A protein has these predicted regions:
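Acidic donor-binding loop of glycosyltransferase active sites
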Residues: 263-279, 293
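Conserved acidic donor-binding segment of nucleotide-sugar-dependent glycosyltransferases
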Residues: 309, 313-321, 329-335
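Nucleotide-activated donor-binding/catalytic signature segment of Leloir-type glycosyltransferases, i.e.
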Residues: 237-260, 268
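Conserved donor-binding/catalytic core segment of Leloir-type glycosyltransferases
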Residues: 189-207, 213-217, 226-227
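N-terminal strand-loop element at the rim of the active site
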Residues: 6-17, 21-74, 100-102, 149, ...
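Donor nucleotide-sugar binding/catalytic pocket of nucleotide-sugar-dependent glycosyltransferases
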Residues: 137-178
Length: 370
């Protein structure tokens, strides 16, 4: 089976790498077709080939308007060039297609799969939602990461249920094999000694950081610290005016080595998201499972399906009271943390393993090829 996994903008290198490596272990001939990752180093190929075909002339800092403009200029020529490359594949598996109204006309004439990392475009307008719906209709199969995601695709976006397959997002266990390293310098050289709760990932309004800080304000756990680590995509100044005690910030993109150090040190990982209408899972949650970390999750999207494994505490979204209570319980009870950690490791080795995801993905490919 010759498979091309395609992520034009290199939005999710960890996911791309883990999927390609797992498909290769399962016997597929895999090529990752993407672009250079603008924020730092990406995982090295492991059993698959790498082809950085897209946006080779992109200029400007990562995330800048200049870089976006140069990528848009290259988009149509690169998608057309990719169509000639795709003739060597039995199946083409897109991870992202972000110019929805245009990309459906540029798909290669091969069996195509699209993973719905974002069920809807970010901050969607009506025209974007319509374009996303048409794009889903143009591919042969759509992958959701949870039953919740499947329901959203079918009920809200009108995708044919026969073309939607639920395949769990694998746990990022490759990150656990990174050598022991130093924490980000912003966290200080001295270990705080007390328990640490970690909030990790791009800082966006829907992730509930304001609710988390309010919950932390009333937490009575002595010596506990909250580490907020990730690149801001929102204004942080209003949140930093009255910070509660014990909060440390790393407001930037961190390396994989720093990421691994943060997760190893944390006792609890917290995802207090206020909404997941546009997506159904989280790479941060996949990382927490891989490291065997107990999690506190808002009851949104597909998070409840992970909590059902026993790996997480589930709390109502946008409510600091229950969030505070769950954090206090876990930070203060090592025995309970061990219980949830064991369930997290079992989930990462079982239903949320990349080998399980690869098996199900290959089954889908074979159905499409016939």
């Amino acid at each position: 089976m010759r498979v091309q996994v395609v992520d034009p903008s290199a939005y999710t290198p960890p996911y791309d790498h883990a999927l390609c490596a797992a498909l290769a272990r399962a016997g597929a001939d895999v090529e990752l077709v993407t672009s250079a990752f603008a924020y730092g180093s990406a995982p090295a190929p492991d059993g698959y080939r790498l082809h950085e075909l897209f946006y080779r002339r992109a200029r400007g800092p990562a995330g800048s308007r200049v870089r976006l403009a140069t990528k848009l200029l290259e988009h149509i020529p690169d998608m057309l060039r990719y169509r000639s490359v795709a003739t060597g594949a039995d199946v083409v598996h897109f991870q992202w297609l972000t110019v929805q109204w245009l990309d459906r006309y540029l798909l290669p004439s091969r069996p195509t799969v699209l993973t719905a990392h974002d069920l809807l475009p970010r901050e969607p307008r009506l025209a974007q939602v319509r374009a996303q719906r048409r794009l889903y209709g143009a591919v042969d199969a759509v992958i959701a990461h949870s039953d919740y995601g499947r329901r959203q695709l079918v009920l809200e976006l009108g995708v044919d249920p026969a073309r939607v397959r639920v395949i769990h997002h694998g746990a990022f266990e490759y990150l656990t094999r990174i050598a022991e390293g130093e924490l980000p310098p912003e966290l200080g050289a001295d270990d705080p000694g007390g328990p640490v709760a970690l909030f990790f990932g791009l800082l966006r309004p829907y992730k509930g950081l304001d609710v988390l800080l309010e919950a932390w304000r009333g937490l009575g756990e002595p010596g506990a610290e909250l580490w907020i680590v990730g690149r801001p995509r929102m204004a942080l100044e209003p949140l930093r005016v009255r910070l509660p005690r014990g909060v440390r910030w790393v407001p930037r993109f961190v390396s994989d080595a720093e990421l691994a150090a943060c997760f190893r040190r944390a006792e609890v990982v917290v995802l207090p998201y206020s909404s997941t209408e546009r997506f159904d899972f989280s790479g941060v949650l996949a990382t927490a499972l891989a490291f065997g970390k107990p999690t506190v999750l808002s009851d949104v999207g597909g998070f409840g399906e992970v909590a059902a494994t026993g790996a997480a505490r589930l709390v109502p979204p946008r409510d600091p009271g229950p969030l505070r209570a769950a954090l206090a319980e876990l930070l203060g009870d090592p025995g309970l943390r061990s219980q949830l950690a064991e369930a997290a490791r079992a989930a990462a080795a079982g239903p949320y393993s990349w080998d399980a995801a690869a098996r199900r993905t290959l089954e889908l490919y074979r159905e499409l090829v016939g």
